[in-house]
Curated annotation (Swiss-Prot):
This is Cytochrome c oxidase subunit 3. It comes from Aedes aegypti. GO terms for molecular function: cytochrome-c oxidase activity. One of its GO terms (biological process) is mitochondrial electron transport, cytochrome c to oxygen. It is an enzyme of class 7 (translocase). GO terms for cellular component: mitochondrial inner membrane. The gene is mt:CoIII. Belongs to the cytochrome c oxidase subunit 3 family. The keyword Ribosomal protein does not apply. Component of the cytochrome c oxidase, the last enzyme in the mitochondrial electron transport chain which drives oxidative phosphorylation. The respiratory chain contains 3 multisubunit complexes succinate dehydrogenase (complex II, CII), ubiquinol-cytochrome c oxidoreductase (cytochrome b-c1 complex, complex III, CIII) and cytochrome c oxidase (complex IV, CIV), that cooperate to transfer electrons derived from NADH and succinate to molecular oxygen, creating an electrochemical gradient over the inner membrane that drives transmembrane transport and the ATP synthase. It is a multi-pass membrane protein. Keywords: Membrane, Mitochondrion, Mitochondrion inner membrane, Translocase, Transmembrane, Transmembrane helix. It is found in: Mitochondrion inner membrane. It catalyses: 4 Fe(II)-[cytochrome c] + O2 + 8 H(+)(in) = 4 Fe(III)-[cytochrome c] + 2 H2O + 4 H(+)(out).
């Protein structure tokens, strides 16, 4: 029986990566729980290595299928677009839960918090120092990633590389400043609901910045190897959508937690 069919859809081959990815994720979570209970972090590191290797090889296969084998046809790309859109929508609701927790606690502070917000004993960050600089950095990175998209659409190879490089650089700079802010923070995640909501919301956003930076870095390497064209570059578009989503979430974080919540 022939495995070929007269349709435009990509029927993927058998792959070990979903299995190894599941093993890596389970090992990582198990190792993290062990680490929390003062055990060795070896299992956690092993899980991360398995997961990273799986991600690299899985994405390598997808890049090969879409770039060299021509398997990402227009209907397949349309399905990928809808998948990315639904993924970003799910991420929106993920962050809505953190904003809900923050506003629930700040708009009706309990007696245990002294019925004030920020709670007694909490010294919040000055919103016009590092947080404002981080806002400017992410807004600038949104401009550079749009510059990269327009350059790619115009087949300007050099400017696409330059703008993607600046975007990745700004993402790394943001992460460094966020790490410095955490180190210098006058409160911790254990300091009542303010510390919990602050570090969980900004921490998950910081994780998304790291993911987005990695996403754009891969796009930079792929573009340097001529994987993208002006008409076939959904991998880059997905990274740009994700990065703009990260920008918008940060604006809400800055306005609600750093500025209004202060």
């Amino acid at each position: 029986m022939s495995t070929h069919a007269n349709h435009p859809f990509h029927l993927v081959d058998y792959s070990p990566w979903p299995l190894t990815g599941a093993i890596g994720a389970m090992t990582t979570v198990t190792g993290l729980v062990q680490w929390f209970h003062q055990y060795d972090n070896t299992l956690f590191l092993l899980g991360n290595i398995i997961t990273m290797l799986t991600m690299y090889q899985w994405w390598r296969d997808i890049s090969r299928e879409g770039t060299f084998q021509g398997l990402h046809t227009i209907p397949v790309t349309l399905g990928l677009r809808w998948g990315m859109i639904l993924f970003i929508i799910s991420e929106v609701f993920f962050f809505i839960s953190f904003f809900w927790a923050f506003f629930h606690s700040s708009l009706s502070p309990t007696i245990e918090l002294g019925m004030v917000w920020p709670p007694i004993g909490i010294e919040p960050f000055n919103p016009f120092q590092i947080p404002l600089l981080n806002t400017a950095i992410l807004l600038a990175s949104g401009v550079t990633v749009t510059w990269a998209h327009h350059s790619l659409m115009e087949n300007n190879h050099t400017q696409t590389i330059q703008s993607l490089f600046f975007t990745v650089l700004l993402g790394i700079y943001f992460s460094i400043l966020q790490a410095y802010e955490y180190i210098e923070a006058p409160f911790t995640i254990a300091d009542n609901v303010y510390g919990s909501t602050f570090f969980v919301a900004t921490g998950f956003h910081g994780l998304h910045v790291l993911i987005g930076t990695s996403f754009l870095l891969i796009c930079l390497f792929r573009h340097m190897n001529c994987h993208f064209s002006s008409s076939h570059h959904f991998g880059f578009e997905a990274a740009a959508w994700y990065w703009h989503f990260v920008d918008v979430v940060w604006l809400f974080l800055y306005i609600s937690i750093y500025w209004w919540g202060n």
